[in-house]
Amino acid sequence: MKKTSIAIIFLFMGLQLAAQTKYLRSIAETQELSKDVVSLFKENNIAASFEQLTPYWPMPQNELDAIEEKTIKYLNIIRDRFGKPIDTLKIKNETIADVALRETYLVRYENTAIRIIFTYYKNDYGWIVNAFKWDDSFTEEFE
């Protein structure tokens, strides 16, 4: 009986996790999500940006929470040191056939910029966030 109960609990947990995952239906939707998240980054509304990403990013919630917390901390430091955000700029769009897409943006501050990279993967159900990264290494974008 215990084994059955445990199996049922894990089944419901698995169903709950699967039910939480949403899929983007097109590249246009991935681009819209990226643009919205970057705009929220510029406004320093990190909590809202993660709320936008989370339904499409199959990652444990505790890991997402940790990334969000660190992002809030470091973006506040960037704003204090390098001034207010000025604007955003999409700088690159890369694809691997019809299965992967990477979009790169800059959020420009008064005295520096941060780079935001979204990687999307297309599975049988649609597009998901495969990776999301931001850093201050925008100079790596020079060719």
Can you annotate each of these PLM segments?
Residues 5-6, 19, 66:
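Intrinsically disordered, low-complexity segments enriched in glycine/proline and serine/threonine
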Residues 17-18, 60:
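A short hydrophobic/aromatic micro-motif that marks alpha-helical segments and, especially, helix-coil
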Residues 18-43:
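Short, low-complexity N-terminal intrinsically disordered segments enriched in polar/charged residues
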Residues 25, 31-32, 47-99:
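Short solvent-exposed beta->alpha transition segments
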Residues 92-143:
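Exposed beta-sheet edge and beta->alpha loop/turn motif
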